[in-house]
């Protein structure tokens, strides 16, 4: 994508009939605003426009709830009990829809499909968290397991800390060269400030290395880098 790139959007739920003009000046654009100011709705509208313009399979949107349906294995959400070892991410049909899935499941499917993405994410997990990751298919369903690098014991992704799931989701989307436009709602969710700074560096690197357009919304100062007044656009 060439910059500056201007989008004209209508977010009726937030701005009524008023047309909003948004200009992307580089490969990384950051939306900052108070709660309920319309950041998420604006991201979703941009998602729809980008999918229409360049193709649905070139655009990836990551929800702020990247844990998705994994949450019912982590927290009591109804009267039923769920065993983490039974957690599956989906079948081959779900995998084919990975770029439309807005939670971390889509990124685990990307790691299964693209071994280059798997290798890059695995290397960083080992360094950052002392973790190995394993992706297996069982009776037509994909399962993900983790284990410490100094142990042979494994456990389900549903039992892993949410910070790892969030980091993996974002890293896999950044490294997936199929994705030309990546929109991330609140990438800082569950992350320590040091990890937020690390992910910001990875985003900037991916924008340059893969010519990727990345748009994020955030409340975190760690996700905002201003070196000069000219970087504060409109």
Positions of PLM-derived features:
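Switch/communication elements of ASCE P-loop NTPase nucleotide-binding domains
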Residues: 1-51, 139-234
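Coupling/switch segment of ABC-type P-loop NTPase heads
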Residues: 51-129
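Short beta-strand
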Residues: 133-138
């Amino acid at each position: 994508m060439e910059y500056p790139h201007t989008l004209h959007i209508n977010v009726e739920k937030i701005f009524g009939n008023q047309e909003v003009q948004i200009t992307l000046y580089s490969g990384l654009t950051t939306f900052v605003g108070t709660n309920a100011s319309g950041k998420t709705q604006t991201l979703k509208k941009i998602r729809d426009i980008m999918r229409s313009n360049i193709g649905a399979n070139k655009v990836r949107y990551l929800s702020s709830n990247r844990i998705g349906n994994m949450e019912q294995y982590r927290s009591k959400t109804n009267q039923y009990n769920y065993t983490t070892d039974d957690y599956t991410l989906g079948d081959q049909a779900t995998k084919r829809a990975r770029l439309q899935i807005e939670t971390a499941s889509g990124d685990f499917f990307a790691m299964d499909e693209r071994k280059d993405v798997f290798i890059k994410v695995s290397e960083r997990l080992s360094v950052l968290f002392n973790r190995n990751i394993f992706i297996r298919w069982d009776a037509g369903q994909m399962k993900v397991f983790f284990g410490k690098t100094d142990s042979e014991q494994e456990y389900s992704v549903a039992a892993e800390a949410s910070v790892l799931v969030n980091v993996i989701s974002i890293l896999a989307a950044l490294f997936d060269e199929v994705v030309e436009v990546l929109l991330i709602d609140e990438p800082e969710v569950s992350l320590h400030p040091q990890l937020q700074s690390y992910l910001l560096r990875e985003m900037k690197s991916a924008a340059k290395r893969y010519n990727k357009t990345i748009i994020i919304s955030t409340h975190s100062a760690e996700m905002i880098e201003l070196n000069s007044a000219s970087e504060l656009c409109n």
